[in-house]
Amino acid sequence: MRHWRIDIVSEAREFAARWGFLTQDLFFEFMCPMSRAHKFRYWNSLVECGHFRRSNASDKVLILSPKSRNIFGDAVRPARQSIYIEHDTIAARVVLALKNRNLISRYWLEDELMRNPVDAFSVLGGEQVPRIPDVVFDLRSNAGGSVRCSLEIERTTKSRSRYAKIALAYLGYSKVSVMLFACDSASAEAVVRQSFSGKAFVDKKRVPGLFNLNEFDS
């Protein structure tokens, strides 16, 4: 193929190094702005050139090859288990949609903060970190600065006690200004809203924004 876009391959590898996987849908939508025929050529070349290997769970999911993993060294994330990929794909779609609009200056994944407790304390601003969000990101503001946001993907409804613990954790995260919960159902939205409804949450402006995750699950 003429005018081979090395940057497309690089972006795909860098994404997989952080997230532990790459789906065909994410690659087509956010990383390969070409005709459908060219999208498939690039997708297939990721494996043929040795950058990736196909997941045993689906031929529409790729994971980094040993060769690519060696390039990224210790920073590379382990290959994501197939049971978590649907959940993580939703989070990735939100992040990539904002990044493509140049709205995110930086982001951190749960796995990255779990592996680096010092970073977790610094990024979240808590004396204790009993709960790490799925994603934390800095959203660019009109004033030229940024607003730190957290994103939680709720594909299943947890117990009320579990959400109560999550809400209490957020009370202590002084550096998180906006909390976003993407919920799969109205019942999940109701439980999350109730968990953050006490006076302490209102006084500290710890009231989350809720939206339907199915808007991004395509």
Regions of interest found by a model, annotated:
Residues 68-93, 98:
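Short, amphipathic alpha-helical interaction segments positioned at domain boundaries
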Residues 1-79:
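Nuclease-adjacent, charged terminal/linker segments that flank catalytic cores
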Residues 97, 101-105:
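Extended alpha-helical interface modules used as scaffolds for assembling large macromolecular complexes
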Residues 148-150, 175-182:
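Hydrophobic beta-strand segments of well-ordered beta-sheets in folded domains
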